[in-house]
Amino acid sequence: MLVWLAEHLVKYFSGFNVFSYLTFRAIVSLLTALFISLWMGPRLIGWLQKLQIGQVVRNDGPESHFSKRGTPTMGGLMILTSITISVLMWAYPSNPYVWCVLFVLLGYGIVGFVDDYRKVVRKNTDGLIARWKYFWQSVIALVVAFTMYCIGKDTPATQLVVPFFKDIMPQLGLLYILLSYFVIVGTSNAVNLTDGLDGLAIMPTVFVAAGMGLVAWATGNVNFAAYLHIPYIRHAGELVIVCTAIVGAGLGFLWFNTYPAQVFMGDVGSLALGGALGTIAVLLRQEFLLVIMGGVFVMETLSVILQVGSFKLRGQRIFRMAPIHHHYELKGWPEPRVIVRFWIISLMLVLIGLATLKVR
């Protein structure tokens, strides 16, 4: 909204023209979200401790996690607040793509909040009933998917970009809605599954958001889009502001979530962040790229699917415990080692994903 204000003030002082530059707004969006998150952290943690809103640890989990019982959770509230304020300050309010991401972010945040509330206040370790969680995730995803289809059905915004092939971009039509639905819901749940160790989910989220921010900048620039042979999407540039806000809020949260964590993000954070990343990828037509960049999330999800499938079909487990980060814990890896190695893998995958934009 400051952009609109600056447009009115620029006639009085030309210096306000800096607010029209995307790179400037991206940087200050990151810093704004970072500082808000750092400011909120101690206050939110103190408030959660006062209300005794602490993590509920399952009895069948790794023994090393029993010491985490009672650690404040629902810290995702600081992430969502930081992102929302920063985006509203620095993005163009007229951009429909920005509102699509915010709708998913806040909608999934509410679903996650209800889930966390049932866990930590009602002391129900199962949280929100799975079918109801999936129902509301589906409703939100379908509303946004249909909205995005209506916005972009007559533009390249409904094409499917295939890595390594610059001339293969099929027009999806109504299938765009179905694909968008699965990407948004799937990414949301994948990040949620990854959020099992201190800082494990937030850094891959930061890396992927940073990578998607670069893609958004290229997609919204007609010259770079043509150079990289990706669809030029007029509204996509403003998603850079959303991505940098996620990066800033994520780094601010990591300040308090790094091992040993002072606060956990809870489902209010993980479901919302995953949904936001999925929505951004769909808007940029980079669903395949998200699979590469978010490979850690994919790996965690596949480990659960394989574990459950193997146990039901053969009566045997593939891993000592799923998601796979627990498998390495039970193998004797210290928690910080698991976390940092997964971070390194995530960074490598984001760089590989960015490289695929040119390798065509």
Swiss-Prot record:
Membrane-related topology note = Multi-pass membrane protein
Q: Which UniProt keywords apply?
A: Cell cycle, Cell division, Cell inner membrane, Cell membrane, Cell shape, Cell wall biogenesis/degradation, Magnesium, Membrane, Metal-binding, Peptidoglycan synthesis, Transferase, Transmembrane, Transmembrane helix
Top-rank lineage group of the source organism:
Bacteria
Q: Which cofactor does it need?
A: Mg(2+)
Gene Ontology CC terms: plasma membrane
Pathway of this protein?
Answer: Cell wall biogenesis; peptidoglycan biosynthesis
Entries under PROSITE patterns matching the protein: MRAY_1, MRAY_2
Transmembrane residue ranges = 27-47, 72-92, 94-114, 132-152, 168-188, 199-219, 236-256, 263-283, 288-308, 338-358
Name the Pfam families for this protein: Glycos_transf_4, MraY_sig1
Location relative to the cell: Cell inner membrane
Q: Reaction catalysed by this chain?
A: UDP-N-acetyl-alpha-D-muramoyl-L-alanyl-gamma-D-glutamyl-meso-2,6-diaminopimeloyl-D-alanyl-D-alanine + di-trans,octa-cis-undecaprenyl phosphate = di-trans,octa-cis-undecaprenyl diphospho-N-acetyl-alpha-D-muramoyl-L-alanyl-D-glutamyl-meso-2,6-diaminopimeloyl-D-alanyl-D-alanine + UMP
GO function terms (MF aspect): metal ion binding; phospho-N-acetylmuramoyl-pentapeptide-transferase activity; UDP-N-acetylmuramoyl-L-alanyl-D-glutamyl-meso-2,6-diaminopimelyl-D-alanyl-D-alanine:undecaprenyl-phosphate transferase activity
Write down the top EC class of this protein: transferase
* GO-annotated biological processes: cell division; cell wall organization; peptidoglycan biosynthetic process; regulation of cell shape
What's the EC number here?
2.7.8.13
Name the family the entry cites.
Belongs to the glycosyltransferase 4 family. MraY subfamily.
UniProt xrefs under NCBIfam families:
mraY (TIGR00445)
Matches recorded under HAMAP family:
MraY (MF_00038)
Q: What is the purpose of this protein?
A: Catalyzes the initial step of the lipid cycle reactions in the biosynthesis of the cell wall peptidoglycan: transfers peptidoglycan precursor phospho-MurNAc-pentapeptide from UDP-MurNAc-pentapeptide onto the lipid carrier undecaprenyl phosphate, yielding undecaprenyl-pyrophosphoryl-MurNAc-pentapeptide, known as lipid I.
Protein name (record): Phospho-N-acetylmuramoyl-pentapeptide-transferase
| Native source organism of the sequence | Edwardsiella ictaluri (strain 93-146)
